């Protein structure tokens, strides 16, 4: 069983920084299919990871107040690239492909799973990863494996 540390209550400065992270303009920068395509590691990055169709893209749309900045779908495997969004305060929000079941050819799925693993375990500018869990299914072994990469 995973143990989770309880985070201290954020102070007012941290709360305001968190609010500003998502409150300003956010623009799509690029989608990448291999590590060579990543943008320069010149900004801090916050990524959203989780199983296929857990709501990563929808959450990005919700926190940025933009209905479709991140393309969401009811079809598992819709996000097949690592998508980078620039924030006004010089961060990247990163929408990752889902892991687990996807409606795509197996060789394509394997390629983006390798990309996901490489990104999570080796991106120097990655500062926060929000791992979304589907409450209907709970934490699966693959979720634990992803968390271990962090």
Regions found by a protein language model. Name each.
Residues 1-103, 107:
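Conserved G1/Walker A P-loop phosphate-binding module
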Residues 91, 110-150:
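Conserved C-terminal guanine-recognition region of P-loop GTPase G domains, centered on the G4
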């Amino acid at each position: 069983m995973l143990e989770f540390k309880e985070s201290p209550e954020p102070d007012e400065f941290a709360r305001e920084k968190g609010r500003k992270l998502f409150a300003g303009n956010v623009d799509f920068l690029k989608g990448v299919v291999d590590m060579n395509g990543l943008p320069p590691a010149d900004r801090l990055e916050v990524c959203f990871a989780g199983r296929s169709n857990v709501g990563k893209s929808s959450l990005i749309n919700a926190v940025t107040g933009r209905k479709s900045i991140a393309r969401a779908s009811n079809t598992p495997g819709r996000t097949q690239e690592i998508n980078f969004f620039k924030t006004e305060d010089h961060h990247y929000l990163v929408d990752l492909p889902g892991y687990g079941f996807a409606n795509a050819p197996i060789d394509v799925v394997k390629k983006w799973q390798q990309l996901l693993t490489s990104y999570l375990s080796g991106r120097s500018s990655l500062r926060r990863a929000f791992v979304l869990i589907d409450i209907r299914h709970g934490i699966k072994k693959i979720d634990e494996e992803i968390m271990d990469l962090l």
